[in-house]
């Protein structure tokens, strides 16, 4: 499926989990904007990601972080998520989650994702 173009029948959820997804969407803001229609007030949006923004997946103009803004200030993805979800979601928790991806029998990739849990407040 296309997380940026979900069918309208998908709504009134208590929880949406977006595991290692946000930095692989072609327009992550579309996905985040749709969460106000998908998650009921009182529900949760949980996002995990190492925030590895790559042009192969997301054009740089759509990145939520990992860039320098037009005033020269670096923007990290957590800040971008916070801006994108305000005022409909309030941060509930923020944790680092380490994980390992096996590439071959002798090569593994150790990565730390950030988990954020956002409470739908309005």
Model-predicted segments: where are they?
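Conserved Class I S-adenosyl-L-methionine
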Residues: 58-94
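A short acidic, Gly/Pro-enriched loop at the edge of an enzyme's catalytic core
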Residues: 4-16
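A short SAM/SAH-binding and catalytic strip from SAM-dependent methyltransferases
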Residues: 15-27
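Short "lid" loop at the C-terminus of a central beta-strand within the Rossmann-like core
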Residues: 50-57
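Short N-terminal helix/helix-N-cap motif within the alpha/beta-hydrolase-1
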Residues: 8, 26-30
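A short glycine-rich, Lys/Arg-flanked "PGG" loop and its adjoining helix->strand segment in the class I
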Residues: 29-41
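Conserved beta-strand signature within the Rossmann-like core of class I S-adenosyl-L-methionine
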Residues: 42-50
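Core SAM-dependent methyltransferase catalytic element
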Residues: 94-122
């Amino acid at each position: 499926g296309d997380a940026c173009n979900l069918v309208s029948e998908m709504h009134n959820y208590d929880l949406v989990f977006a595991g290692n997804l946000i930095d692989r969407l072609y327009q992550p803001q579309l996905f985040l904007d749709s969460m106000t229609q998908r998650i009921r007030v009182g529900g949760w949006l949980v996002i995990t990601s190492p925030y590895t923004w790559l042009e192969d997946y997301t054009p740089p103009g759509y990145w939520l972080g990992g860039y320098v803004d037009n005033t020269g200030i670096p923007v990290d993805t957590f800040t971008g998520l916070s801006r994108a979800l305000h005022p409909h979601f309030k941060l509930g928790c923020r944790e680092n989650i380490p994980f390992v991806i096996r590439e071959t029998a002798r090569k593994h990739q150790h990565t730390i994702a950030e988990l954020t849990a956002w409470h739908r407040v309005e």
